[in-house]
Curated annotation (Swiss-Prot):
GO terms for cellular component: cellular bud neck; cellular bud neck contractile ring; cytoplasm; HICS complex; membrane; mitotic actomyosin contractile ring; nucleus. It comes from Saccharomyces cerevisiae (strain ATCC 204508 / S288c). This is Cytokinesis protein 3. The gene is CYK3. Belongs to the CYK3 family. SMART domains: SH3, TGc. Its main location: cytoplasm.
Length: 885
């Protein structure tokens, strides 16, 4: 028996016929047999809460539940009903779940022809014909028994969906039997996620722009599916311009075409290794050195030039004229899109039906931030720049996570979790514990072994490879570690790498290795095999691994064969050696260190598996030598790191790959955990062949690194890194350098490259730069975190609130008994271009550290500087600069 939804008056209780997990965040999932109290009806959907847990509430489809009715004198039917239900289960082999209804109400017609034609795997019988057949059959069954004629005619309505009742009636048993025998209908359209997000009463997003209007969004979604029709099995939705017609079919997520395109074995033929030589020896030759070194050097040379900063202010206005459609902050969001109730009907009544009903907005096209002083004073421009660099909260990050996952289903949001969870360890044999090799390496006299290797490695060309290895490395090398070190120095310092130009046969052992032994140059593949043969001659277990090496300026989340390295069993512990990257002639060292090296890179000698997995991805999981093994996708999405990342004991603290896919006015943000004696600097490098554009990018402050807090558990510091791409730039890279604290005294990077993060951007963007942080030798005892303003540009005629947090560099606050000099008070101030000093006021004058604040009316264009008393207590030191335009 069925009832019309329009005749129901909430609240009432329903019981779940099937279990349902929900589709969106606002849905209510339940188990079979759960009882819910319905408080609202929205079309074919109910809104209610679970009676067993009233904290859980949300939307759920009406045809997954049955209405609970209190009936009297139904004990006779209750005794007969279970047997018939059991019979119906015996007649059918499987339970057919009813289709999930559309979230649209019946008053809103939706186009279905385009949707059904775009579904490749749609059933032959449409949904409408199924529903008509079911209605016809139900009518026949109602006519068979006159008992139910009255109730059927009372509740029958063709325009509204029907709800099954929990009454023990014979026609209902027949309907249940037939519903189980019917084929599974096609999945309904997915809910309108954009509309659901608008009704979600959470913290607002960071900033919004005119692109948030429905017309621009629908056009953007149409272009997105059109460009990615191969991923979505050719699905291209209709180009819609109204919110009511916006719908997405779950049929577009068919796996057929996607699996055909992506199905490939990790053990492919070695013919795929056509670019092996490019990453082994010659790929970094064209880079010479990381561009972040030269960019930072040029910025430091131009830091004192006033003309450069005036030109920057002019370029700032020009770039804003070309990209005026950036996000304007939360205030526009509140004006353009009013708050709506979660009820669909109430929101449709309260919301304006046309754009004319909204309050009149300022013309966004006239938002030229610095063309004239009058426009620069505009409060929208000021708020936009102040709020853009605001630190992201979990509510800001979550929509970006969901958007990235929608665009790439294979994306791993937090790949570092598989390494830092404490479960994965380096593989060892027997009952030994991992890490004993590191202890032996610390006690190894490396300088003595390296000098002895240079003296003993005499290649006269008279002995075979095995006899030469046993003669050279057996007498004076007492342990396995010393023998491996000797072979490593021989291969990395006494051979020059040559490019094979793709001629190496990686499926077989290189020929004439004994002749190569007495030469001074070889290809990367030959050098790897030479190390293996020498180690095997000394009885050391050593095997070659051919896999994928992550490289700069490449797509590193797609596996391909391009590199080879060695896995070695030493003292019952598996370690890795890469003689190609450790070789002194490899151009990668000049790229990372900004100079050539004369000694072999020690980081690639007996590298731990948990460190090797960042850059070297083997095709088979057992070759990782990590217990338990790490998923290959997680390893591919780990950031590209270099030896100084592990030398300086850096660690990913809050890192997400989804945040690197920028849209409109978004910024990138990540956090690193660093020791107290290490400093970190970052810069953004834009690849371009245009010299004028490259010079302009060098002078821009596109990254900001600050020490945010001290981690209480470990005593280590948290470095917060933010980055942004300039206007009209789609791709760039974030370069992170690290080194000993206090050694870098200018903006020019002197520390080696530690980490690279690729950044992409789409949509509109306004020019934005971060405040210039200036390192100084005289400020080493305290850490200064600029809360606001973090933007580089200030606008004349506006009042700004300056806020700086001062904390001890070692994280220790001494008591008064330990001496007053331990907690020296270091006041701060803001200096105007004319030389006037505005002192900042401390929030808690009795506490040695804390927050310093001050509100200043900006009236002078030029460079504004942040000052702090030096550690010696004599004189001011500049630690930050802003540019007023």
């Amino acid at each position: 028996m069925a009832t019309n939804l329009t005749s129901l008056k909430p609240p009432f209780k329903v019981k779940a016929r099937y279990g349902w997990s929900g589709q969106t965040k606002g849905d209510l999932g339940f188990l079979e047999g759960d009882i819910m109290e319905v408080t609202r009806i929205a079309g074919s959907w109910f809104y209610g809460k679970l009676l067993r847990n009233k904290k859980c509430s949300g939307y759920f489809p009406h045809n997954f539940v049955i209405l609970l009715e209190e009936r009297l004198n139904s004990s006779t039917e209750n005794g007969r009903q279970p047997s018939k239900i059991v019979e119906s289960f015996e007649k059918s082999n499987k339970v057919v779940i009813p289709p999930v209804p559309s979230r649209y109400s019946d008053e809103r017609p939706r186009p279905k022809k385009k949707l059904s034609s775009s579904m490749p795997n749609s059933p032959k019988k449409p949904v409408d014909s199924l529903t008509k057949a079911r209605k016809a059959k139900s009518k026949e069954m109602v006519n068979e028994k006159n008992i139910y004629n009255t109730q059927s005619s009372r509740h029958h309505n063709n325009s509204a969906p029907n709800l099954p009742l929990a009454s023990h009636s014979k026609p209902q048993v027949r309907n249940f039997e037939e519903s189980m025998n019917n084929p599974l209908p096609p999945l309904p359209p997915l809910p309108d996620l954009d509309n659901m997000r608008k009704t979600d009463k959470r913290a607002p997003k960071k900033s919004y722009s005119a692109n948030d209007l429905h017309m621009a969004r629908s056009s953007r979604e149409y272009n997105y599916y059109k460009d990615n029709q191969k991923f979505y099995d050719g699905f291209i939705p209709e180009k819609r311009y109204s919110l009511e017609e916006d719908s997405i079919s779950s049929g577009l997520f068919s796996n057929s075409q996607y699996l055909n395109d992506s199905a490939c074995s990790s053990e492919n033929s070695f013919a795929l290794m056509s670019d092996f030589s490019a990453t082994s020896a010659g790929s970094f030759a064209r880079h010479k050195y990381a561009q972040s070194f030269s960019d930072s050097l040029q910025r430091s040379q131009n830091a004192n030039g006033c003309s450069t900063k005036i030109n920057d202010s002019q370029e700032f206005g020009d770039s804003n004229a070309s990209s005026r459609n950036g996000k304007m902050g939360d205030i526009l969001r509140k004006i353009i899109i009013p708050k709506r109730n979660t009820n669909i009907y109430s929101s449709s009544v309260s919301s304006p039906k046309s754009p004319k009903a909204y309050p009149k907005l300022p013309d966004i096209q006239n938002l030229n931030l610095s063309a004239t002083p009058d426009e620069a004073r505009d409060w929208i421009a000021v708020k936009c720049h102040l709020n853009r660099a605001r630190t992201l909260t979990k509510y800001d990050k979550h929509p970006r996570y969901m958007r990235a996952l929608e665009e790439n289903r294979d994306l791993i949001l937090h790949p570092q979790d598989s390494i830092y969870n404490g479960l994965n360890t380096n593989e060892v044999k027997g009952n030994t514990k991992p890490g004993l090799v590191d202890v032996e390496l610390a006690e190894l006299n490396i300088e003595y072994i390296d000098k002895m290797t240079w003296k003993r490695c005499i290649r006269d060309g008279t002995m075979t490879l095995d006899s030469w290895a046993q003669t050279t490395f057996s007498a004076r090398y007492s342990t396995v570690l010393e023998k491996l070190r000797g072979i490593y120095i021989f291969c990395t310092e006494m051979f020059a790498l040559t490019d094979d130009n793709g001629t190496s046969d990686f499926s077989a052992e290189p020929q004439n290795l004994e002749k190569i032994l007495y030469r001074k140059h070889c290809t990367p593949y030959e050098l790897t095999w030479l190390f293996k043969k020498l180690a095997n001659s000394l009885g050391i277990t050593c095997e070659i691994v051919i896999g994928f090496l992550k490289t700069p300026s490449a797509i590193n989340w797609e596996f391909k064969y391009n590199h080879c390295w060695l896995r070695i069993l030493v003292n019952k512990e598996w370690r890795f050696i890469d003689v190609i990257l450790g070789n002194v002639t490899n151009p990668i060292h000049e790229f990372v260190n900004n100079r050539k090296i004369k000694k072999a890179e020690n980081s690639y000698f007996l590298m731990a598996p948990l460190e090797m997995i960042y850059t070297h991805i083997p095709p088979r999981e057992f070759e990782q030598h990590i217990v338990p093994s790490i998923d290959q996708l997680s390893a591919l999405y780990l950031p590209l790191v270099f030896p100084s990342f592990f030398k300086n004991e850096l660690k990913l603290y809050k890192f997400s790959t989804a945040l690197s896919f920028l849209e409109d006015s978004e910024i990138y943000e990540c956090s690193l955990e660093i020791p107290n004696d290490v400093e970190v600097f970052a810069s953004v490098v834009i690849p371009t062949d245009n010299e004028e554009a490259s010079s302009a990018y060098r002078n821009m402050e596109l990254a900001l690194t600050q020490i945010k807090k001290q981690k209480a558990e470990s005593g280590r510091r948290i470095a917060l890194i933010k980055a942004v791409l300039p206007p009209n730039v789609n791709k760039g890279s974030l370069y992170i350098h690290s080194g000993v604290r206090g050694t870098q005294t200018s903006i020019a990077n002197i520390h080696p490259l530690s980490m690279m993060v690729p950044l992409t951007h789409k949509g509109s963007n306004m020019k934005y730069e971060f405040v210039i942080k200036i390192p100084s030798e005289s400020i080493q005892k305290i850490e200064l975190y600029i809360v606001e303003p973090q933007s580089r540009y200030l606008f004349v005629g506006n009042e700004y609130s300056f806020e700086v947090i001062q904390s001890p560099s070692d994280g220790i606050v001494y008591s008064s008994d330990e001496g007053p000099n331990q907690n020296r008070k270091q006041p701060m101030a803001i200096k105007s271009p004319s030389g006037r000093v505005h002192e900042l006021v401390k929030s808690d004058p009795h506490f040695p550290y804390g927050t310093w604040k001050g509100s200043i009316k900006i009236k002078e264009p030029g460079v504004w500087s942040a000052l702090v008393i030096a550690d010696s207590g004599i004189g001011w030191s500049v630690f930050a600069e802003w540019l007023c335009v």
